[in-house]
Amino acid sequence: MANVQMLKDAILGGEYDLRFKRVYVTEEAVKAQHQRYVGLANDFAEIFSADREVRLFSAPGRTEVGGNHTDHNHGRVLAAGINLDAIAVASKNDENIVRVKSRGYKMDVCDITDLEIKEDEKGHSPALVRGMCAGFLKYGYKIGGFDAVTMSSVLSGSGLSSSAAYEVLVGTMLNYLYNDGQVDAVTIAKIAQYAENVYFDKPCGLMDQMACSVGGFVTIDFNNPSEPVVEEVKFDFASSGHSLCIVDTKGSHSDLTDDYAAIRSEMESVASCFGKSVLREVDEEEFRSKIPAVRKKVGDRAVLRAMHFFADNARVLKEVEALRNGDFETFKSYILESGDSSYKYNQNVFSVKKPLEQPVSLALALSEELLKGKGAWRVHGGGFAGTIQAFVPNDILAD
């Protein structure tokens, strides 16, 4: 443990470079992190104290690579942590107060002796702090007060799961400040989903939190959501000759909770036609044989979204197999199929509330013009706004 000056000296002296390299990959990126972390340490000294013992923390954003909107209906996903992350400099306190000052935002202050759900906090970051603390206790772990400064390169509303990265960051601080690092990544993800569902009041699945918490390239099967099956997918992406690009369309996710919730509720409305709670429990052949009756009961869009679920859920297995076989061209074809399904069937490329605003649609159209026959592109994550995902051949990346 070190005070702020000792921490800064260690960062600038290269003592963290091996750990930075695991997260940020290139030497150039590692050097850029020196000033980023030192700047955050200076923030801590200015806001709290330069003399307290402090520690560094990081939680990545995520990109969903396969299985678009399948997790909340207990499906499969293929996801990856990315090197855009939320970071923190933090120190324990003995006040039972959590203070988190995120750069550019006002300080969140949470009295953790009161972990009741607060209606006025729903949709705001204090709810995530309170929810993470409540979740740690619910799972039998320790909590305590701490002071932290944070900053994030995972832009809010970008489709890279800024809220999940923030939740996992708070969970990681609680884990190492009060639980000696004994809380595993899967449990932190479950607690993060609990915080977002119950305290933040957003009905998300578990994929975002799991990818942010576990990191790397992972496939996750949520058939039993209390015990999701997480498997690493080993693939040398550098050998593919492509770069994974996340393209910001400048649209925001901040106004779209109802659109996201409708996807889950409509999929579940189809499941209810078969006496089930989620689509993973429904037999696909039975569903297809009864489409006329189902569409009369729950509507055409719900049927289309169910069709997307079944196809994209099965497609994840094909994507994983292609990667493990080193067949990147086949993998790209599945990426294109997934994007087409999201656009036509899941219909999460633009909001029907704002039909004149279609930045994701435009970005996908331009990507097709530029990358057809060369790369792959798709909407990812929640959709409707934010970012798209593109696999771009390195030889045309600069163009």
Listing of model-derived features with the role each one plays in the protein:
Residues M1-R62, I87, S91-K122, T219-R378, ...:
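C-terminal nucleotide
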Residues R76-D94, V214:
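Structural signature of FAD isoalloxazine-binding scaffolds in flavoprotein oxidoreductases
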Residues G81-N83, L160-D180, V392:
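DPxDG-like acidic metal-binding loop motif
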Residues R99-K101, G145-S152, Q182-Y194, K332-E337:
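Beta-strand segments within the central parallel beta-sheet cores of soluble alpha/beta enzyme folds
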Residues C133-S156:
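Glycine- and acidic-rich phosphate- and metal-coordinating loops
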Residues K138-F146, L174-I188, N394-D399:
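Phosphate-handling active-site elements
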Residues D180-V229, S338, L364-S367, V379:
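Alpha/beta catalytic cores of group-transfer enzymes, especially the acyltransferase/condensing modules
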